[in-house]
């Protein structure tokens, strides 16, 4: 059970075990379709370093409070609070928010002023309140008070896109799906030499590749996605990647170029 392995899921695995949980053929095919050089060799090399990546997560991963729950409403609402917002800011209001609004119905019945006061520190207050209200309506009016388990339905509230919907399915309902945001897209580009499209989070090709790379075992899928998110935030940053302290540096095209370790 994933819940027994919170906050990060399964962080200990061998490369051989991992290989039985990914769709290597589909992933390689997606790399070839994207014109990635030496697709199979690159995929194999990266897969060998994923166990180190998960081990790194177990030591350096960020232990946010929402990583200790699989409660669907907490997961869904938290992902809305995290939109365009730092995790540390959301962590500060996490307990007061869910004390006040432990269910979707509590948000539906809340005074506008109370809801606004609780999310004010995060900014984008109008956006946030509207999305939370619509998410609560979705659960209560359309789904008997429960968070939907359908990718399309989860994207019905205003400004809820594939990232938030997929994160909900992954973290609450243990569906082994890939998350595509700026961090995971940047790592994909650097590690594989993957030529990113203009909007990676809307690209079917990017999802096809990363969904094939995400392990089909839920606890591993959780760990793999969290590892990419945290690696992007803590090591593989946009402007200053810290390759010397990165667990997948030996297999990363970008990180190994300077040391002549790239696949020829
Ligand atoms: S080696 Fe460098 S570029 Fe590659 S994933 Fe790690 S931090 Fe990013």
Task: Tell me what each language-model feature is.
Residues 1-18:
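Intrinsically disordered, low-complexity N-terminal extensions of nucleic-acid-metabolism proteins
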Residues 13, 262-264:
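Intrinsically disordered, low-complexity, compositionally biased regions/tails
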Residues 14-43:
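Short, contiguous pre-domain boundary segments
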Residues 38, 43, 52-262:
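Catalytic cores of DNA base-excision repair glycosylases
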Residues 47:
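Extended substrate/cofactor- or partner-recognition/assembly subdomains adjacent to catalytic sites
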């Amino acid at each position: 059970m994933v819940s027994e392995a919170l906050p990060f899921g399964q962080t200990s695995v061998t490369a051989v075990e991992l290989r039985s949980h990914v769709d290597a053929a589909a992933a390689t095919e997606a790399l070839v379709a994207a014109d990635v050089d030496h697709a199979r060799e690159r995929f194999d090399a990266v897969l060998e370093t994923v166990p180190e990546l998960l081990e790194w997560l177990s030591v350096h991963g960020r232990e946010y409070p929402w990583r200790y729950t699989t409660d669907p409403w907490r997961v869904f609402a938290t992902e809305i609070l995290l939109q365009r917002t730092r995790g540390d800011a959301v962590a500060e209001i996490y307990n007061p928010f869910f004390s006040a609004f432990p269910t979707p119905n509590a948000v539906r019945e809340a005074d506008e002023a109370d809801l606004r006061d609780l999310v004010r520190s995060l900014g984008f207050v109008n956006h946030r309140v509207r999305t939370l209200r619509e998410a609560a309506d979705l659960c209560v009016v359309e789904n008997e008070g429960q968070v939907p388990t359908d990718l399309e339905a989860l994207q019905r509230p205003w400004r809820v896109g594939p990232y938030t919907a997929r994160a909900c399915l992954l973290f609450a309902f243990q569906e082994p799906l890939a998350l595509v945001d700026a961090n995971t897209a940047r790592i994909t580009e650097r590690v594989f030499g993957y030529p990113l499209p203009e909007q990676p989070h809307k690209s079917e090709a990017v999802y096809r590749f990363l969904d094939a790379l995400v392990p089909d075992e839920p606890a591993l899928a959780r760990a793999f996605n969290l590892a990419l998110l945290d690696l992007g935030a803590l090591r593989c940053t946009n402007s200053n990647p810290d390759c010397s302290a990165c667990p997948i540096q030996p297999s990363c095209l970008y990180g190994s170029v300077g040391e002549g370790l790239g696949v020829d």
